[in-house]
């Protein structure tokens, strides 16, 4: 498990803001420093899809930044982090990263993470996908990003929506060697 590390969490406007919120909760329990960016679209999605206020979500993070603040600490490669998780990642955010637009703090921080060869995990949320979406995913993967859509697994027999959410975020946290006891891991036994 990583100790005294910093992880950037971004919540974009795609459906599934609960993934980002649950990540923040788990990382807070693990005493891992989080740097949060909530897009304007995500603020609307959080209000529409969850019981959380924006302030409650921000309270889960150690540091919060406005998505328009391109001068924030996380926009510089000299600010050391373990990497970044965008949960959920909209197709707009994916496209911005794939084409190096860096027109918001989310896409700027993602670009920094890629150029510094740190971990960038995109929990992409869209279905069905057209060829442009797939090409953007391929570009980001070529740059070193990891495309990790929150696809449920059923071998652990989920009975609650939180079981499905926890499975997806555990898989993402595995990339950072962060151990949790949220799920039953696959075993042939």
From Swiss-Prot:
SUPFAM superfamilies: Homo-oligomeric flavin-containing Cys decarboxylases, HFCD (SSF52507). Its EC number is 2.5.1.129. The keyword Transcription regulation does not apply. Pfam families: Flavoprotein. It catalyses: dimethylallyl phosphate + FMNH2 = prenylated FMNH2 + phosphate. It is an enzyme of class 2 (transferase). FMN binds at residues 13-15, 39, 90-93, 125. One of its GO terms (molecular function) is flavin prenyltransferase activity. The keyword Translocase does not apply. Gene3D superfamilies: Flavin prenyltransferase-like (3.40.50.1950). Keywords: Flavoprotein, FMN, Prenyltransferase, Transferase. Dimethylallyl phosphate binds at residues 155, 171. InterPro entries: Flavin_trans-like (IPR036551), Flavoprotein (IPR003382), UbiX-like (IPR004507). Flavin prenyltransferase that catalyzes the synthesis of the prenylated FMN cofactor (prenyl-FMN) for 4-hydroxy-3-polyprenylbenzoic acid decarboxylase UbiD. The prenyltransferase is metal-independent and links a dimethylallyl moiety from dimethylallyl monophosphate (DMAP) to the flavin N5 and C6 atoms of FMN. HAMAP family: ubiX_pad. Belongs to the UbiX/PAD1 family. This is Flavin prenyltransferase UbiX. The gene is ubiX.
